[in-house]
Amino acid sequence: MNFVGAQAASTPNVIIIMADDQGYQDLGCFGSPKIKTPQIDRMAKEGMRFTDFYSGASVCTPSRASLLTGCYASRVGNLGVLFPRDKRGLNPNEITIADLLKAKGYATACIGKWHLGHLKEFLPTSQGFDTYFGVPYSNDMTIDVSQPLANDIVLREGVTLENIKNRVKKNLVPLMRDTEIIESPADQNTLTKRYTE
C-alpha cells in the first residue's frame, strides 16, 4: 500500500510504503548487499528514514489498520486477515492518516494492496483517500461477486462473467479503480509498472 500526499512547495510530500513480508535489510538504504533498490534508496537519502519501528501485527489486515490509524489493531476491530467473503473492514468512522492529511489540504491517493475491506464503505475512498488504484486483498485470493464491475472491465486468462459468478477459478484478485473492479484477474506481470506510472 502506497500513500501519496502533495500540497504547496513549502509543505513536504508524504509517501508511506508498506510491503508485506519485507525484512529490515531488504532495501539498499537499510544495508542490503544483494537487493538493489536505487529509487527507494534515493528517496531515503533525500527524505526522512525511520530506523526504529514496529509492525502493529504480523499479518496484512491488522498491520495496515494499525499503520493508517495509529491504533492497536484490537482497538479498531481488525484482528485477522480479511477474505473476499468477509463483509467487514476498517470502520469508516476511524480517523486515518489520510483523513488528517486531507484536512490539511493534501491530495491523497492509495496505490497497491489495500486489504482493509473490499466493500464500498471500507475502500480507501471512504477512508480519506481521494483516489485508489490497486488490489483489495492478497494476490492469491478471488473476487467477491457482489462488487460492482466497471462497464469496460477487462477479463483475462479465460475468465468470464459466468465463472466469476460461479467462483470457478481461484487466484482472481481483481484490480480496482476507486470503487469499481476494472480487471479480473489483475495482470500480475504488469501491476508494478502500472502502479508506478
Q: What name fits each language-model region?
A:
Residues 1-197:
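Formylglycine-dependent sulfatase
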